[in-house]
Amino acid sequence: MTLLEMKKKVLRLIEEINDKSSLLTDDPDIANKINDVINQIQNEIARIKKIPAKEELEVAKGDEIDFSDIAKDLFQINIVRGVENDIIGNTINFYGDGTAKIYYYKYPKQITADTKDSEFTFDLSTDVLEIMPYGVAGDLLKSDISASYGQVYSNRYEQMLQRLDPRFHTGSIYLEGDDTSEFL
């Protein structure tokens, strides 16, 4: 999904869309803050439904690598394979030579006022992108005192977040051998 598509979803939801306007809305307050709000909501959701990534690094025994040296968008290490290691704080200590496969979670690409709506695509999964418009709508309308729509959208967003499955897959097990009936 592009940023343009997300904005249209949100603005249709809150009934503020104007397809003829280059800003997509006639409300200057919404136009001024929608990118910031979308960015804030995507960062919030990415801490729940994390975005997986992988880097491979050639390492030597005794190397100590800071998380920030692996990837600038690194949020959290998942697992490191290929070379014996320990993770202490924000540093990976390696106890051998070889190729380290570093599986981690990353922050999403950031949205600014200069982000091109039709060129930006989200890193987030489809289930997350279906929840986001409610969080954005709730934040955009939270200061609208004439109606409680902001609270309605915020409540719906919170309900949907609680049902969000943070997993990308479930584990599986494979049994092999002559007599596996004792395991069944």
Question: Where are these predicted regions, by residue range?
Answer:
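Glycine-enriched, solvent-exposed interface loops adjoining structured elements
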Residues: 1-184
